[in-house]
Regions:
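Hydrophobic alpha-helical transmembrane segments in multi-pass membrane proteins
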Residues: 53, 57, 182-187
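Hydrophobic alpha-helical segments of secondary membrane carriers
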Residues: 49-53, 174-178, 245
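Transmembrane alpha-helices of multi-pass small-molecule transport proteins
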Residues: 49-64
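Juxtamembrane transmembrane-helix boundary motif
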Residues: 1-23, 27-39, 43-44, 63-151, ...
Length: 261
């Protein structure tokens, strides 16, 4: 494929992926990674490419959510610090830990949380207080799994916090804003392992420069739109959308894991 073709294709991928992530608080990494892998990009290149692109898209997304008052500063600070620590640690061990070993547990957890979200939204009285207990450990876990598996910050953190009864708009905005700092930590660590030669299978990431640029440009275009979208959509609609998205992602990953896809 030509450089221009790669840029245009992944520009569209970045636009769609960032809109999903900005509006629902998850799935940029999973969406972008799926297209990169399908295009024949090696897993190591895919993870690093997505995190490089997210340097820019998460900054734009976080700024958009902040401008629409979708961010709780206390929650943002806790998630940013904890997620960055967990993400950096995960990036440092990703060359020695097989992500496939923990993937079945992640899939099961996501499916469970998807059911919990739908149950809370459709069957119970909404609890609109933002969760404060256990946020730091959750952020560390989300950052760690995001680095290990190439995605997972949004599905793990957003899903868990909404599942506890938090207001989706504020949860999604705060988690998206914190993701910039998590991505910065993960991306920096991944690049360091590639440059120093510790990640033997990474190869020359510059081969994917056009795809990375496309992901960045597409994401920057859609970030403000998604930030506005989440600020006006009713809580029940947003919560149901998140729950269904989580179940869909879990089902897709389970099918891929068992060889059905």
């Amino acid at each position: 494929m030509s450089v221009l073709h790669d840029f245009l294709v992944f520009g569209l991928v970045g636009l769609v992926a960032q809109f999903i992530d900005g509006a629902l608080g998850m799935a940029y990494g999973i969406t972008a990674s799926s297209f990169l892998l399908a295009a024949g990009v090696p897993p190591a290149h895919t993870s690093a490419s997505v995190h490089i692109a997210k340097f820019f898209t998460t900054a734009a997304s976080g700024a958009a959510h902040a401008s629409y008052k979708n961010v709780d500063r206390r929650l943002l600070l806790t998630l940013a610090i904890a997620g960055a620590v967990g993400g950096a640690f995960g990036a440092l061990v990703v060359t020695t830990v097989d992500a496939a070993l923990i993937k079945p547990f992640i899939i099961g957890y996501l499916a469970l949380m998807g059911v919990v979200i739908l149950w809370r939204i459709l069957r119970t009285t909404p609890q609109l207080n933002l969760p404060r207990q256990g946020v730091a450990p959750l952020g560390m876990l989300g950052g760690f799994l995001d680095a290990i598996g190439g995605g997972g910050w949004g599905p793990i953190v957003t899903t868990s916090l909404i599942g506890r009864g938090g207001e989706p708009r504020m949860i999604i905005g705060s988690v998206n804003a914190a993701e910039f700092f998590v991505t910065l930590a993960i991306g920096s660590a991944l690049i360091a392992t590639i440059v120093t030669g510790h990640w033997k299978d990474a190869g020359d990431i510059l081969n994917n420069a056009a795809a990375i640029a496309g992901l960045i440009v597409g994401g920057l275009i859609s970030a403000p739109i998604a930030g506005r979208f989440v600020s006006v959509v009713p809580r029940k609609v947003l919560g149901v959308a998140v729950g269904l998205l989580v179940l869909t992602l879990a089902g897709y990953q389970a099918a891929a894991l068992t060889g059905l896809l």
